């Protein structure tokens, strides 16, 4: 072995051995407990970033530790390969999305392999491959048969210049990102999945999951189970009687209704706008806004009076109807009751347009004022009804019950449970996605593609130009025959939401070569024992994958109803930011590698200059690594300079997995320095370590006993920390071990070999290359087998036994020294030793002991 640690040589040698042995290819084994750990599959954007490195290293550490502990472990990998970024890159570069995607996959796969990850590449999938998305199509058709998938009109963002549908993120300040045209809302037919059918189960099953509480709460809020009242305001229009239906969780405030607001797309709005250009113009303006709920929440609230009124169902009073841009047709009934006295949004709307505000609940000790909104106005818990006739004095629950009963008696409505969750619209008017397997026949209508004709293959040679869907222009794809009548027909050109692709890939990993969607192997591996990914996926991906799993279960494909038992949301990787700002306020961001920072005498940054010109740049603070802030660190540069093990060690040591990690060049250098020490000790003591000298534990000297006691004590803590996923303290434990071994004076070769072997095994899951090569070079592999499957070291409890223990010695309650006594010393022997100790003589001022307090195993206090 080399005297000097050369990461490139060490890692090439270790990876060569692993490839030759096909070390990570995994099969089902009923004789072992299984552990299936999955990192959320990446989008093949071009290069790995440090967030990827951290995620996959956490997974890899878990895999290796559990494999050493006798588990049948599996770590697969794949590519979430469909999606809009590929189309955008294709337009920018004039190449098909397929080429861009596959090139990126090749490069990123090479990066992963250079990290030494324990991935079973025989299970690799790419969601853009027909053998994968065939099963998206197959399950979609099964859902169509069961009524879980259905078609209805939905609202989309329409760019009138590019003649294309835009995703919410492509609408910038109400305009198309490419054309700059004002975006319109359009109603088009789309396919939906009835996720609402599973709302109760999705909510209730959260209780049994080992997921972060924060994620569970986010899902609970997204599902949004509400108990309230659904009722209608009666009206008559053109001789027809009807109800304007609303849902409210605050029926206790019904006597405070002073207006109703309806969505621009509401059928009543359409009727009222007939012959009224001003109303129609406002409706058109609303339709030009984005359809994202977040956009609606933050935009300026606008409205227009329709001149029409409905009737309050309990008072008989006229209630004005307004059209509001903040009311979404896709939520609730597309109409809301306006209670400005007790709803902050309604309060602002009423103040803006001079609408009446009526107080109908009061809280003791609080004074109501129309001058400004106060938090208690909307508090249902500390208030009672006022100015509400027969409901005066009632608290929230009593008032809701009474109002609901009266509405029901009048035929206007009743109590209802509603959900914030809406059915999942899966149609996307994009090219690079799973084709929806439907054929449009002029005679037969919408016809599902027969199962034997799946997959409907997406052409991979098209280049989007930003004007419409390329599939609609591809005659080879578009034209087909109707499976029912044989007439000329057209294929559906919409593709599926890419969240479909990521909703079940972890199940396909378990049976990647199956000629069915999944098989018996899936029930062996699933559900995942550990899922790892960012908190940003807490709602959509994780909710959709739970729904998809439950559908697969109900169709008899699998026996489980949840995809993941446990979830780890790793923290973000942060780094410093630096920028310059021009006269227009535009900021140019500079990478930390291109900046020199000056510090004060306490190490705090006080200034920075750009290396290229020596001129100052502004310190922007620590933020998440991102392209927009140009503060990322290229993992490949790091690996090339320091080696993969250093990158792995730093990302595991710098912070616990679930917390944010602040990047530190000094920390990386420290990790590299530690690995050089590990190697140097092995190389410098290779003769003693490789000699395989034995020893008799009973006859060891004090130095050997002390070293073994320290190593096994630290091992016990490291093992505990591995189990609770606190890998930063595992690394700390390994550092303690190395210090103890390196500093041991008088330890014999046999004990050095034993304790260094423990260190290598403790470090191996975190830094597999250097430990694997040292294990082999020093002969441990000949004794225990390759480090890949070497047994995890067991704590030698006998080594932890001490003949003597050390007690704190106090005089009059103050610590004055330490007292060594035999482990099994009697109370009397301890008292005698304490009084005889020089510390007592020094601090007792010659006075005799009046009382001696002994706390077994801890301290002795002599009172004089």
UniProtKB/Swiss-Prot annotation:
Enzyme class: ligase
Chief site of localization: cytoplasm
GO biological process terms held by the UniProt record: leucyl-tRNA aminoacylation
Residue numbers covered by motif 'HIGH' region: 42-52
One Gene Ontology term, aspect cellular component: cytosol
Catalytic reaction equation(s): tRNA(Leu) + L-leucine + ATP = L-leucyl-tRNA(Leu) + AMP + diphosphate
Gene Ontology molecular function terms on file: aminoacyl-tRNA deacylase activity; ATP binding; leucine-tRNA ligase activity
Subcellular location as annotated: Cytoplasm
Positions with a binding annotation for ATP: 627
EC number(s) from the headed UniProt entry: 6.1.1.4
Organism superkingdom: Bacteria
Keywords per UniProt: Aminoacyl-tRNA synthetase, ATP-binding, Cytoplasm, Ligase, Nucleotide-binding, Protein biosynthesis
UniProt motif 'KMSKS' region: location: 624-628
Pfam name, any one: tRNA-synt_1
InterPro entries noted in UniProt: aa-tRNA-synth_I_CS, aa-tRNA-synth_Ia, Leu-tRNA-ligase, Leu_tRNA-synth_edit, M/V/L/I-tRNA-synth_anticd-bd, Methionyl/Leucyl_tRNA_Synth, Rossmann-like_a/b/a_fold, tRNAsynth_Ia_anticodon-bd
Family stated for the protein in its record: Belongs to the class-I aminoacyl-tRNA synthetase family.
Name by which UniProt lists this protein: Leucine--tRNA ligase
Species per Swiss-Prot/TrEMBL record: Burkholderia vietnamiensis (strain G4 / LMG 22486) (Burkholderia cepacia (strain R1808))
Gene: leuS
């Amino acid at each position: 072995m080399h005297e000097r640690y050369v990461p490139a040589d060490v890692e090439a040698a270790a990876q060569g051995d692993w490839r030759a042995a096909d070390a990570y290819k995994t099969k089902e084994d009923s004789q072992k407990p299984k552990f299936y750990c999955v990192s959320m599959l990446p989008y093949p954007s071009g290069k790995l970033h440090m967030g990827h490195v951290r995620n996959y290293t956490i997974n890899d550490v878990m895999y290796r530790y559990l494999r050493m502990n006798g588990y049948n472990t599996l770590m697969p990998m794949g590519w979430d390969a469909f999606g809009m970024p590929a189309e955008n890159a294709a337009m920018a570069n004039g190449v098909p999305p397929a080429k861009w995607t596959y090139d990126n996959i090749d490069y990123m796969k090479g990066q992963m392999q250079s990290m030494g990850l324990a991935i079973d590449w025989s299970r690799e999938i790419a969601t853009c491959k027909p053998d994968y998305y065939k099963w998206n199509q197959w399950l979609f058709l099964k859902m169509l048969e069961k009524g879980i998938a259905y078609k209805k009109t939905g609202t989309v963002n329409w760019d009138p210049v590019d003649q294309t549908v835009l995703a919410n993120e492509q609408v910038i300040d109400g305009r198309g990102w490419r054309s700059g045209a004002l975006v319109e809302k359009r109603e088009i037919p789309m396919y939906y999945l009835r996720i609402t059918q599973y709302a109760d189960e999705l909510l209730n099953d959260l209780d049994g999951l080992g997921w972060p509480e924060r994620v569970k709460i986010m899902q609970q809020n997204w599902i949004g189970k509400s108990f309230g009242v659904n009722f209608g305001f009666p009206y008559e229009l053109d001789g027809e009687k009807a109800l304007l239906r609303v849902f409210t969780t605050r029926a206790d405030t019904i006597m405070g209704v002073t207006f109703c607001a309806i969505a621009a797309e509401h059928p009543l709005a359409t009727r009222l706008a007939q012959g009224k250009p001003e109303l129609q113009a406002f409706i058109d303006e609303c339709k030009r806004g984005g359809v994202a709920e977040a956009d609606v929440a933050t935009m300026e609230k606008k409205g227009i009076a329709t001149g029409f009124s409905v009737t309050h169902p309990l008072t008989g009073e006229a209630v004005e109807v307004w059209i509001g841009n903040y009311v979404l047709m896709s939520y609730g009934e597309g109409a809301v009751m306006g209670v400005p006295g007790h709803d902050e949004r309604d309060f602002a709307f009423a103040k803006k347009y001079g609408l009446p505000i009526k107080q109908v609940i009061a809280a003791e000790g609080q004074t109501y004022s129309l001058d400004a909104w106060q938090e208690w106005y909307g508090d249902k818990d500390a208030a009672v009804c006022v100015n509400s006739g027969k409901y005066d004095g009632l608290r929230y629950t009593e008032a809701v019950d009474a109002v609901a009963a009266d509405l029901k008696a009048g035929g206007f409505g009743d109590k209802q449970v509603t959900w914030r969750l809406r059915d999942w619209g899966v149609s996307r008017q994009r090219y690079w996605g799973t084709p929806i397997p439907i054929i449009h026949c002029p005679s037969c209508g919408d016809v599902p593609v027969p199962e034997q004709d799946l997959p409907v293959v997406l052409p991979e040679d098209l280049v989007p130009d930003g004007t419409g869907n390329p599939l609609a222009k591809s005659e080879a794809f578009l034209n087909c025959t109707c499976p029912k009548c044989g007439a000329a027909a057209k294929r559906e050109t919409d593709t599926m939401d890419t969240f479909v692709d990521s909703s079940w890939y972890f199940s396909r990993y378990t049976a990647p070569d199956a000629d069915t969607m999944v098989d018996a192997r899936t029930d062996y591996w699933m559900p995942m024992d550990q899922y790892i990914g960012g908190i940003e996926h807490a709602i959509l991906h994780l909710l959709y994958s739970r729904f998809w799993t439950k559908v697969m279960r109900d169709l008899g494909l699998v026996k489980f109803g949840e995809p993941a038992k446990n979830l780890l949301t790793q923290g973000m990787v942060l780094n410093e930011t630096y920028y310059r700002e021009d006269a227009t306020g535009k900021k140019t961001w500079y990478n930390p590698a291109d900046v020199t920072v000056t510090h004060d005498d306490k190490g705090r940054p006080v200034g920075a200059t750009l290396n290229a010109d020596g001129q100052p740049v502004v310190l922007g603070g620590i933020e998440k690594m991102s392209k927009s802030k140009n503060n990322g660190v290229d993992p490949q540069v790091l690996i090339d300079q320091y080696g993969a093990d250093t990158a792995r060690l730093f990302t595991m040591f710098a912070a616990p997995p679930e917390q944010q990690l602040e990047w530190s060049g000094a920390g990386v250098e420290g990790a590299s320095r530690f690995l050089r020490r590990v190697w140097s000790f092995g190389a410098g003591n290779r003769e003693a370590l490789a000699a395989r000298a034995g020893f008799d534990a009973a006859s060891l000297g004090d130095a050997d006993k002390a070293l073994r006691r320290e190593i096994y004590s630290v091992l016990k803590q490291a093992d505990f920390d591995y189990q609770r996923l606190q890998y930063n303290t595992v690394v700390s434990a390994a550092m303690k071990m190395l210090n103890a071994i390196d500093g041991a004076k008088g330890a014999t070769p046999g004990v050095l070999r034993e304790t260094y072997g423990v260190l290598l095994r403790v470090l191996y899951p975190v830094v597999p290359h250097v430990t694997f090569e040292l294990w082999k070079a020093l002969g441990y592999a000949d004794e225990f087998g390759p480090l890949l499957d070497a047994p995890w070291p067991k704590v030698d409890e006998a080594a932890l036994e001490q003949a003597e223990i050390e007690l704190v010695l106090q005089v009059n309650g103050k610590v004055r020294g330490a007292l060594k006594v035999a482990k099994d010393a009697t109370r009397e022997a301890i008292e005698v030793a304490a009084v005889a100790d020089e510390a007592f003589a020094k601090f007792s001022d010659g006075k005799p002991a009046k009382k001696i307090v002994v706390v077994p195993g801890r301290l002795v206090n002599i009172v004089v």
